[in-house]
Amino acid sequence: MINKDIYQALQQLIPNEKIKVDEPLKRYTYTKTGGNADFYITPTKNEEVQAVVKYAYQNEIPVTYLGNGSNIIIREGGIRGIVISLLSLDHIEVSDDAIIAGSGAAIIDVSRVARDYALTGLEFACGIPGSIGGAVYMNAGAYGGEVKDCIDYALCVNEQGSLIKLTTKELELDYRNSIIQKEHLVVLEAAFTLAPGKMTEIQAKMDDLTERRESKQPLEYPSCGSVFQRPPGHFAGKLIQDSNLQGHRIGGVEVSTKHAGFMVNVDNGTATDYENLIHYVQKTVKEKFGIELNREVRIIGEHPKES
């Protein structure tokens, strides 16, 4: 039963067309899984995010943020409270050697804008399917580059709805980690300081990275991207491969035969299938090599109710 008081309060804070009730979240995840959100809102202004977060905090309503859903699994039980989609905060601005991008902008698009302005430093991001907000949240990286290498600052909102501007140092960016996660902040926009370069050289590097990605990753199936973090001194994919787990399937989800670090939805898989397969892989690798695999992918939402 949807809380009418919450709905009416949201209508005072954000235009009605930006509010959806009992919205299926599988529409917004790369895995094509997930239950419904009680309330799903799509703000287009920073002030709208602040207003909703402040209201939710004052009324003890849980808030969940969603970018483009590329490195997340949402359980079939859905998400209670308010889900805030940041995808409409997608502005990209160039000023001299800097780029300022909204949380919802695709980091791929930001890397392409940098190329178009002959700015180097974001080539590594040309194949990362996440949004700017998600990329800062987890210090996304690929092929030797990371967000922390070029970010200047991030404008965030805290749990009380207040704006906070954090410098590179204050963001505490580490391997797939940041102060954003620890303090339950949300990124509204981020600025990147780049360097002048040659467009042809930038394009050549992006072409090379794109070819490497397409040849090695199972892009033909829905997936949540890289499932596990890299254990110190090892590669998660190699450990999974050496455990003879490629092709292992639970329900409709299997460990990719193309890249063992990925799990793909090959036959109407569910979030429960993903979660069970993740646990099985972790258990098997631990038993075989004594190494813990920590998840890179986020798993959120409630478990489905048993019928």
Curated annotation (Swiss-Prot):
GO BP: any one term: cell division
Keywords for the protein's UniProt record, in alphabetical order: Cell cycle, Cell division, Cell shape, Cell wall biogenesis/degradation, Cytoplasm, FAD, Flavoprotein, NADP, Oxidoreductase, Peptidoglycan synthesis
Stored Pfam families: FAD_binding_4, MurB_C
GO CC terms, sorted: cytosol
Reactions that this protein is recorded to catalyse: UDP-N-acetyl-alpha-D-muramate + NADP(+) = UDP-N-acetyl-3-O-(1-carboxyvinyl)-alpha-D-glucosamine + NADPH + H(+)
Chief location category: cytoplasm
GO molecular function, one term: FAD binding
Enzyme Commission designation: 1.3.1.98
Domain FAD-binding PCMH-type: 33-197
InterPro entries: FAD-bd_PCMH, FAD-bd_PCMH-like_sf, FAD-bd_PCMH_sub1, FAD-bd_PCMH_sub2, MurB, MurB_C, MurB_C_sf, Oxid_FAD_bind_N
Highest taxon of source: Bacteria
Annotated metabolic or biological route of this protein: Cell wall biogenesis; peptidoglycan biosynthesis
Subcellular location: Cytoplasm
Cofactor: FAD
Active site residues per record: R176, S226, E296
Stored PANTHER family: UDP-N-ACETYLENOLPYRUVOYLGLUCOSAMINE REDUCTASE
Family: Belongs to the MurB family.
Function: Cell wall formation.
Listed name of the protein: UDP-N-acetylenolpyruvoylglucosamine reductase
Species this chain originates from: Staphylococcus aureus
